[in-house]
Amino acid sequence: MLAKRIIACLDVKDGRVVKGTNFENLRDSGDPVELGKFYSEIGIDELVFLDITASVEKRKTMLELVEKVAEQIDIPFTVGGGIHDFETASELILRGADKVSINTAAVGNPSLITQIAQTFGSQAVVVAIDAKRVDGEFMVFTYSGKKNTGILLRDWVVEVERRGAGEILLTSIDRDGTKSGYDTEMIRFVRPLTTLPIIASGGAGKMEHFLEAFLAGADAALAASVFHFREIDVRELKEYLKKHGVNVRLEGL
């Protein structure tokens, strides 16, 4: 059985990590390369860099950053945010990203999923899906959770797998930032719809939440602030999960 993965997410703007981090032993907590390296050394299984830079002109900064990260880190890393076309996705992968995460662009142009998958392999395509309940149905939202697409979550999950995605990053808008736990109802809803790995996102606040996500059917769990602010120690988290019967990677810790 494949090991369940713990993923740290870094929001990057103009080549710097935003949302404060307070690792005392890091000289520059705003440097994504240094932070990424630190995370890889303490047992995080994968990294996700979300580029929240608004302007296209700043894209060059992200490309240079990806190259630096690729040189320094020996765990898989995904780059997402603002990838609107095949050219951008392609350049990020060629510069060293292991995977690209697409969201709004995939909804607007589903063939982009297929194009990336056919060129680089399905394993390089993560489709990020932001969803929330509307009148009792899980609906897909885009533009950072602001726009209701009118697409049912169940339909979009099936579609992205058919198009060639390798993984789904499932974020519960209702839970994001609340630290009240992952949306296990949503994970359980999606699990039977697809054979793709599901990354649970949104709501991590304590170690039990990770266990709940895995028991609900998630293959990986992503978190940001609980790691950045050292509210959860990665080694302790993995030992806790192992103790509760979850297969996690402990070697090197």
UniProtKB/Swiss-Prot annotation:
Functional summary from the UniProt entry: IGPS catalyzes the conversion of PRFAR and glutamine to IGP, AICAR and glutamate. The HisF subunit catalyzes the cyclization activity that produces IGP and AICAR from PRFAR using the ammonia provided by the HisH subunit.
The organism's place on the tree of life at top rank: Bacteria
Gene name tied to this protein: hisF
Pfam families cross-referenced by the UniProt entry: His_biosynth
Protein name: Imidazole glycerol phosphate synthase subunit HisF
Organismal lineage: Bacteria, Thermotogati, Thermotogota, Thermotogae, Thermotogales
Keyword annotations from UniProtKB, A to Z: Amino-acid biosynthesis, Cytoplasm, Histidine biosynthesis, Lyase
Amino-acid biosynthesis as UniProt keyword: yes
Subunit structure as annotated in this protein's UniProt entry: Heterodimer of HisH and HisF.
Organism listed in the record: Thermotoga sp. (strain RQ2)
Catalytic activity, reaction form: 5-[(5-phospho-1-deoxy-D-ribulos-1-ylimino)methylamino]-1-(5-phospho-beta-D-ribosyl)imidazole-4-carboxamide + L-glutamine = D-erythro-1-(imidazol-4-yl)glycerol 3-phosphate + 5-amino-1-(5-phospho-beta-D-ribosyl)imidazole-4-carboxamide + L-glutamate + H(+)
EC class (word): lyase
Pathway(s) the chain acts in: Amino-acid biosynthesis; L-histidine biosynthesis; L-histidine from 5-phospho-alpha-D-ribose 1-diphosphate: step 5/9
GO terms for cellular component: cytoplasm
Active-site residues per Swiss-Prot or TrEMBL entry: 11, 130
GO molecular function: imidazoleglycerol-phosphate synthase activity; lyase activity
Similarity-based family: Belongs to the HisA/HisF family.
Gene Ontology BP terms: L-histidine biosynthetic process
EC number: 4.3.2.10
